[in-house]
Amino acid sequence: MSFDQDSARYDERHRALALAFRRADLTFEQLWNRYFALGGNAGLIEVDAYLHGLTEFSALQHDILAHAINERLDETWPQRVPYSFPPRATGPHTGPLAGLVKLLDGMHQAPPELLPVVAARAGQALGLRITIYLVDYEQSMLHPLREPESPHLASLGVDSSVAGRAFRAVETVPSTTGQQPRLWVPLLDGVERLGVLDVVSPNGADLGDPELRLRCRWLSTLIGHLVTISTHYGDGADAVRLQRARTPAADLIWQLLPPLTAATGDFTVSGLLEPRYEVGGDAFDYALSPSTATLAIFDAVGHTLRSGFVAAAALAAHRSTRRAGHGLFEQARAMDETIAGQFSGGAFATGVLAELDLYSGRLRYVNAGHPEPLLMRSGKVVKRLTGGRRLPFGLGTGELTVAEEFLQPDDWLVLHTDGVTEARDHNGEFFGDERLRNFLEREAASAHPPPETARRLVKAILAHQNDVLQDDATVLLARWGKRNELTL
């Protein structure tokens, strides 16, 4: 650029600044105070002289002064003073970061129904076409979360489709539909399985590219988190996942449950309950920290809304005491007092409270009239945990003994309610302890992770009863000492 051109630009900026100052409705003192607060180092007299064209400023000092005026103009007038240097871009417009930013910005104050639209725009920033499929609460079908007025898409079976394979195994699976290559990417919130993403590249990008798959993983992680968050303030996602209305008792319990699966380092826990829409008194809970995993499972007497209230009270008493830093003794006592104090007529809940030291494998537990937990080691059910027996919660404290067991790396702990082993077929035959043991050992040989094992177990219990349960059936599976594989 020539000297004359440079001088002309300087004069233009100076004239614009002087004009803007007149419109800013500021005194020299007010302008200088703003300029000085932004880091300007010229004195009041120098600023006055510069505005009247009697002296010159460096480009940096001009821009600081211009910014002080622009801040005022933002309050009073739409025109702005031009800067010496072009302003930086306000955000990414292409690439993986642009896709993530579009998701975050797009879902800010957006209802759940807009999530497929926002996800599609995020995919476009990566040159991809993305469709969200959410798993239903039966974990049997994957249903599309469609954009408004988009073409109809068929639901896909968890046990009978490539998409279902990606969901079951928690791994990205490539496939080709017609001539169109695609990726099925597990949709996770943390390690909880929510569904899959259908990823297609309209531009013919190589879907085997590790960098592209990594970007899909980032999108999946954020979309999964947004699905969960949006469920707290809207029903759009649940409308897809719910295949029929829950009973009030079931809805109460579901709103109190933690995520169905969670993991920290080398510990994974996964729970599931059935029937999804009519569960009455079953519930489970857990809390994970770097050093400790706390587990709990409850079965309140009866199958009515009152049973749901008892289970909810037990869960709340357990959580509030645990969060206050108290141990198993205090947790059990709080549950006794809460149930006995709030419900008449002999209300109670059976249950197991357990606390695992994640450094040593030391397990401490209390069993309040509940089926005994099972310990699996090297793919075999090696023992029942028979200690720590006491009365059900709500029937009096009595004597309380905390039992101990030491786990070894890769051990599994299996907690369940009586609806699992007491499930009956049409001939009245129980599912039983032996069938449960055989099922767990077969699953261990298949190397399925805890959430898939829980899903298959509940499915087996339903099949044993011709899909009609006589009682709630809940399982809580925990594995310690093996790095979890529930990542993409």
PLM region spans:
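Amphipathic alpha-helical "output/dimerization" segments
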Residues: L207-T228, A312-A316
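Short hydrophobic/glycine-rich mini-motifs in sensory/regulatory modules
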Residues: A42, V185-A205, P290-T294, D410-W412, ...
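A short, aliphatic-rich beta-strand micro-motif
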Residues: V173-S175, Q180-D189
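Regulatory loop-to-helix N-cap segments in sensory/regulatory domains
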Residues: G195-R217, E422-A423, D467-V468
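Catalytic core of PPM/PP2C metal-dependent serine/threonine phosphatase domains
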Residues: L126-L128, A245, A249-P258, L305-L391, ...
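Structured interaction and signal-relay segments at domain junctions
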Residues: P96-Q109, L115-E171, A368-G369, R390
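Regulatory cytosolic signal-relay segments
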Residues: L219-V279
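Active-site-proximal, acidic helix/loop segment immediately C-terminal to a metal-coordinating Asp/Glu
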Residues: T304-A324, L407, D411-V468, N484-T487
